């Protein structure tokens, strides 16, 4: 092999190794940030009722479900909150320290993100409250009222109820 070919070969090997190392580091970094989504039933029983597909203790996950009525316990001396979360099956316990979203309440759907500390206990770092498709934030609702009043649009129209819906309700009475 002549010296010119040798230097090209070294350059190609160097570039391929650089790309491989960069790809490996990217995959490793992304793997650290992947939070798999589970329902409370899947946390307890595994996905598709397969115990081999249960999240492991210490794994970062996201769990979505409904806050069980009567299970919200707040620590009076701190921002710690503990509540149960379920879907149609068994419930898991969520422990969270921080300010809960305004839409958080019992019987409401939420998504909690955190680390599974025991097989059925999630230490949440973030709690997101879900709302229905008709939700309008109060500030936006007020601004929309000001803009739409001159046009003759009623407040009920802004909350997802059309004139036809109101007529159907009145006709049913």
From Swiss-Prot:
HAMAP family recorded: CcmE
What biological-process GO terms show up in the record?
cytochrome complex assembly
**Annotated heme binding sites:** 131, 135
User: What are the protein's GO molecular function terms?
Assistant: heme binding; metal ion binding
Protein name (record): Cytochrome c-type biogenesis protein CcmE
Give the compositionally biased regions (Basic and acidic residues): 156-173
Pfam families the UniProt entry points to: CcmE
